[in-house]
Design a protein with these regions (language model features):
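Non-ligating segments of multi-cofactor redox enzymes
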Residues: 1-145
């Protein structure tokens, strides 16, 4: 509904192929940065950021320029060692190792109920206020893929 009200087109990460470049768009905002694990990190909510949709505008708008530096530049980077199964590599992510861990009791408690340990290890994520039920919902959706 919003898209028709402001003369735009709604797009979602799952639309495609071709898939919209959400990752690149996020970085271009100057509010999201590439973390040491290649996940997006947001200046306010850390690694808990997720992009569920976007609006493609049919008119030009001015976007404020954000010259902030990545919060990772001054961080001790706890995300790099937080994964209990070392699923994050320099250039890849082992989703099967992650899902296997989530199927055992320890993994269910540590990550399924409380959120991805890597994401929650980010100091900025600790202050984001995400509701535990929202975290559980997204972890269940991840396991269904």
């Amino acid at each position: 509904q919003l898209s028709s009200e402001i003369n735009s087109k709604a797009v979602y990460p799952s639309d495609g192929p071709p898939y919209a470049p959400f990752y690149s768009w996020a970085v271009l905002t100057g509010k999201a940065f590439v973390s040491p694990l290649k996940l997006l990190v947001h200046e306010d909510v850390g690694l808990m950021i997720s992009y569920r949709g976007a609006l493609i505008l049919y008119q030009s708008i001015e976007i404020p320029i954000n010259c902030e530096k990545s919060p990772c530049e001054t961080c001790r980077e706890p995300c790099k060692s937080a994964c209990p199964v070392d699923a994050f590599k320099v250039s890849s992510y082992d989703s099967s190792a992650c899902k296997s861990y989530l199927s055992i009791e320890t993994g269910q408690h540590m990550c399924s109920e409380n959120g991805c340990h890597v994401r929650t290890s980010c100091p900025l994520s600790a202050t984001n206020g995400r509701h535990p039920e929202q975290t559980k919902f997204h972890m269940k959706a991840f396991l269904k893929k």
